[in-house]
Amino acid sequence: MALTLEQKQQVVAEVSEVAANAYSAVAAEYHGIGVAKLTKLREQAREKGVVLKVVKNTLAKRAFEGTKFESMSDRMTGPLLLAFSMEDLGSAARVVFDFSKDNKALETKLVSVGGVVYGPEELERVSKLPTRDEAISILMATMNAPVTKLVQTMNAVPGKLVRTVAAIKDAKEAA
């Protein structure tokens, strides 16, 4: 069933809004994957805050105009599934990477992060990016480390003095 002009405009507006708010995107060829597996992929994506869209490439190219994913338009060919990360940089890549381990028919074509388009070989690396909470945790640990070391150093001096005095006392009592 062909889409009417109004339906096409609605699809373009919807994808454009998602793309404008997304942190990263993954385009993967889904040819040969059954409906049940695609439904499972959509469920996994929803749980991770990833939006999946299957749209015609011409509509996707129009939707990407003026967004950071505009550079993907030139390389989009074939039936593509678009996954958009809405919560952190690597969530879409994680969902697609994990799903493609078990389903070889899902073949990654493009990965876009921050307006830069990467090939499929970068999917695993992008999927290993920390989540927002993990990044904050790493940052806080890094900021906390110098203070912790300073406190440990400051506590070491009085502790050493107490041990020295105790050793002198034990030596005098033994003599």
From Swiss-Prot:
GO CC aspect terms: ribonucleoprotein complex; ribosome
SUPFAM superfamilies assigned to the protein according to its UniProt record, in alphabetical order: Ribosomal protein L10-like
Please tell me whether the keyword Ribosomal protein is annotated for this protein.
Answer: yes
Question: Could you state a single Gene Ontology molecular function term?
Answer: large ribosomal subunit rRNA binding
Superkingdom of the source species: Bacteria
UniProt keyword RNA-binding present: yes
InterPro entries in the record, alphabetically?
A: Ribosomal_uL10 (IPR001790), Ribosomal_uL10-like_sf (IPR043141), Ribosomal_uL10_bac (IPR022973), Ribosomal_uL10_bac_type (IPR047865)
Q: Which UniProt keywords apply?
A: Ribonucleoprotein, Ribosomal protein, RNA-binding, rRNA-binding
**Which CDD domains does this entry report, sorted A to Z?**
Ribosomal_L10
Cited Pfam families: Ribosomal_L10
Which Gene3D superfamilies does this entry report, sorted A to Z? 3.30.70.1730, 6.10.250.2350
Q: What Gene Ontology terms for biological process does this UniProt record contain?
A: translation
Q: Which family does it belong to?
A: Belongs to the universal ribosomal protein uL10 family.
Describe the protein's quaternary organization and the partners it interacts with: Part of the ribosomal stalk of the 50S ribosomal subunit. The N-terminus interacts with L11 and the large rRNA to form the base of the stalk. The C-terminus forms an elongated spine to which L12 dimers bind in a sequential fashion forming a multimeric L10(L12)X complex.
Query: What HAMAP family does this protein map onto?
Result: Ribosomal_uL10
Function (record text)? Forms part of the ribosomal stalk, playing a central role in the interaction of the ribosome with GTP-bound translation factors.
Q: What is the protein name stated in its UniProt record?
A: Large ribosomal subunit protein uL10
Origin organism of this chain? Psychrobacter arcticus (strain DSM 17307 / VKM B-2377 / 273-4)
Q: What is the lineage of its organism?
A: Bacteria, Pseudomonadati, Pseudomonadota, Gammaproteobacteria, Moraxellales
This chain is encoded by the gene named rplJ
